[in-house]
Amino acid sequence: MSIIGVGIDVAEIDRFRASLERTPGLADRLFLERELLLPNGERRGIASLAARFAAKEAVAKALGAPGGLYWTDAEVWVEDSGRPRLRVTGTVAARAAELGVQSWHVSLSHDAGVASAVVVAEG
């Protein structure tokens, strides 16, 4: 296996919160419903959502930042162990297939008012 692409992104949590509050329906355009909710059905916290948004941006960068990708075609989910994972479908899966991506690695963090994500596409 070799690295096909690496993406990194950061999101200021308060700015991300303001964007969601200012733009009704934005969360639904960025995230699948299961990304918005915790396993117990409660709404996920803003820092966690900001990190997931950063991951989606990082995915696009790892794929060469092509246009035409849909936010909801890159889903960030978490294993029971707490390890973040990436599931791609539609436009993102098509671009990944073009490049020969076979696996993804994702790391999320949020601290001091900033959320960040690193994504590695491997093929």
From Swiss-Prot:
GO terms for molecular function: holo-[acyl-carrier-protein] synthase activity; magnesium ion binding. It catalyses: apo-[ACP] + CoA = holo-[ACP] + adenosine 3',5'-bisphosphate + H(+). It is found in: Cytoplasm. One of its GO terms (biological process) is fatty acid biosynthetic process. Its cofactor is Mg(2+). Its EC number is 2.7.8.7. Pfam families: ACPS. Keywords: Cytoplasm, Fatty acid biosynthesis, Fatty acid metabolism, Lipid biosynthesis, Lipid metabolism, Magnesium, Metal-binding, Transferase. Mg(2+) binds at residues 9, 57. It is an enzyme of class 2 (transferase). Transfers the 4'-phosphopantetheine moiety from coenzyme A to a Ser of acyl-carrier-protein. This is Holo-[acyl-carrier-protein] synthase. It comes from Streptomyces avermitilis (strain ATCC 31267 / DSM 46492 / JCM 5070 / NBRC 14893 / NCIMB 12804 / NRRL 8165 / MA-4680).
